[in-house]
Design a protein with these regions (language model features):
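Conserved beta-ketoacyl condensing-enzyme motif
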Residues: 6, 50, 54-154, 282-305
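Acyl-CoA/ACP chain-elongation machinery
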Residues: 182-183, 190, 232-239, 301-302, ...
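Condensing-enzyme catalytic core mediating Claisen C-C bond formation in acyl metabolism
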Residues: 1-93, 194-268, 276, 372-373
Length: 373
């Protein structure tokens, strides 16, 4: 059994950003046109009038101020409100592969590794571009990595589940090092005409190098002390888009073919589950919550993160204890907690302990205990 470390992280950020004000302007233009087009039916009570949104509402509900996106114009067009992403030929690298390459190159550089040092690729994300061939095998080919690759989807927890899979492979000697990447085009499955959720998601890609400790040489190493995962079935976060939709044409275009959630139920049910999993994980490793210097939590909602930290610590978290990146990135699904790790790790002293945690649809929750080398 080999000791395992994270030796490098990377981040790909799209060039385009949308502020709350821009998003609200587009949404309200759609609402005004809808209400005007349906004025007679609304007056008769046959159609419910839509309600405008505001930047203040979005920030109060989520803590989000802006988000990065792969396409801005298509989202902000009130007549479209969907990103415009052109199809590519089968001979071109796909857009998820392109994002993964950008994040992977930074992770490899921070780890001091090349493609020749990597034996496997795991693409772990919520929104895979296609059923097959696996996006991971495409990334593997694009980077010139020998070995194997596969895709996995555990929604917003995909990164922590991917980290456990990568850790197991390296521990058991099945690979010297694994590249785990999380390319997320969340805006592709978001209903920008839904007032309660149109502001939630952004796009990004993260990458992590997991390797044998005795082969690691970078200045950015974290021992992977332990991993713990849990799932519990729930319909409160769901997306029913899939290849079987064409076999049931009556459902094509229905709202459940995009992201839908029961937000209040998710908040009420998931927060205590996350706090309990992390607390039990620490106890199993003879650690106290007070031993943890940093919590890199899934970046879905500021109020959720504040509550989880409060449940764990018994008080409000200090600014550096549970860093927030969702104000500028929004919810990037599986990439969020890794963005927090990537941007808030270099200041930690040797020996400092941290917890990387994700939570989302499934329900699925992951906890990874890390120790700075």
């Amino acid at each position: 059994m080999h000791n395992v470390v994270i030796s490098g992280t990377g981040l790909y950020t799209p060039a385009n950003s949308i502020s709350n004000d821009e998003l609200v302007e587009s949404f309200n233009a759609f609402v005004q046109q809808f209400n005007a087009d349906n004025a007679a039916a609304i007056a008769k009570g046959e159609v419910e009038a839509l309600v405008e949104s505001s930047s203040a509402f979005i920030e109060r509900a989520s803590g989000i101020k802006s988000r990065f996106v792969v396409d801005k114009d298509g989202i902000l067009d009130p007549k479209r409100m969907t990103p415009r992403i052109a199809e590519r030929s089968n001979e071109q690298w796909g857009i998820l592969c392109e994002m993964a390459i950008g994040a992977a190159q930074e992770a490899l550089a921070r780890a001091g590794k090349t493609a020749a040092d990597i034996d496997g690729v795991i693409v772990a994300c919520s929104h895979l571009q296609r059923a097959y061939p696996a996006v991971a095998i495409e990334v593997q080919a694009a980077l010139g990595i020998q070995g194997f690759g596969y895709d996995m989807n555990v929604a917003c927890s995909s990164a922590t589940f991917g980290l456990q899979a990568a850790t197991n492979a390296v521990q058991l000697g099945q690979a010297r090092a694994i590249l785990m990447v999380n390319p997320e085009i969340c805006t592709g499955h978001l209903n920008f005409r839904d007032r309660d959720s149109h502001f939630i998601f952004g796009d990004a890609c993260t990458a992590v190098i997991v390797e044998r400790a005795d082969l690691a040489s970078s200045a950015h190493q974290f021992d992977i002390v332990s991993t713990k995962l849990i799932t519990q079935f729930s319909n409160n976060i769901r997306n029913n888009f899939g290849f079987l939709n064409r076999a049931a044409q009556e459902g094509v275009g229905a709202s459940d073919k995009l992201f839908v959630q029961e937000g209040r139920k998710v908040f009420k049910e998931v927060c205590p589950m996350v706090a309990e999993l992390i607390a039990s994980h620490l106890a199993e490793n003879q650690l106290n919550v007070s031993d943890i210097k940093r919590f890199w939590l899934h970046q879905a909602n500021l109020n959720m993160n504040l509550l989880i930290a409060r449940k764990l610590l018994g008080r409000d978290a200090e600014p550096g204890e549970a860093p927030v990146i969702l104000d500028s990135y929004a919810n990037t699904s599986s990439a969020g907690s890794v963005i927090a790790l990537h941007k808030h790790q270099d200041d930690l002293p040797s020996g400092a302990l941290g917890v990387l945690s994700s939570f989302g649809a499934g329900y699925s929750i992951g906890s990874v205990i890390l120790r700075k080398r």
